[in-house]
A protein has these predicted regions:
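Bacterial Sec-dependent N-terminal signal peptides
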Residues: 1-20
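A residue-level detector for conformationally permissive "hinge/kink" positions
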Residues: 2-4, 37, 105
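Active-site-proximal alpha-helix that buttresses catalytic centers in soluble enzyme cores
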Residues: 18-103, 118-124, 128-160
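Generic beta-sheet signal
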Residues: 21, 105-113
């Protein structure tokens, strides 16, 4: 009888179909060499990366995505180390958003990108053109997208 009850419960408990996506731009970068296409974080950026770690430490992040640039990888590194996850690299120019959504169903995901890619990423997730490019000096935007079945909610907050 217990075995039947266990089997029944295993098949009757719905799988969590809700997903949460946190999307941020990389922290402040070194700007002394305008021709450097892959700068590292400056001192303020290193501090912001630590602040992001403190923000995300209790969010139960299950996957971390980052572009393959020094500034994004350095932004995510303290978070990655604190929660013990590997970073999954992605390219904004080649991402299939429908596949991204389906492969992260039921997950709590952090995505780190750039001022000119994160707003579009959010727009693709929510299937609407709500957000515009981030000002180049703004590194504090946090976009939150929640998806439960066909219900999608989104929010933009500033985290300093």
């Amino acid at each position: 009888m217990r075995l039947l009850l266990t089997i029944f419960l295993a098949f009757s408990i719905p799988e969590n179909d809700c997903s949460t996506f946190y999307l941020i731009r990389h922290a402040e970068k070194i700007r002394t060499n305008k021709s450097d296409r892959d700068p590292k974080l400056n001192e303020k950026g290193i501090l912001r990366a630590l602040n992001w770690k403190n923000y995300f430490i209790d969010k139960d992040i299950s996957k971390i995505y980052s572009t393959n640039y020094n500034r994004t990888l350095e932004t995510v590194k303290p978070i990655q180390k604190a929660i013990g996850l590997n970073t999954i690299l992605y390219s904004p120019s080649s991402i299939d958003y429908k596949d991204f959504i389906s492969s992260n169903k039921g997950e709590i995901v952090l995505v780190v990108g750039h001022s000119n890619t994160i707003p579009n990423f959010v727009n693709e997730l929510i299937n609407d053109q709500v957000y515009t490019q981030i000002d180049d000096l703004n590194n504090s935007n946090l976009y939150i997208v929640n998806m439960c079945d066909s219900n999608i909610s989104h929010n933009l907050i500033e985290v300093n």
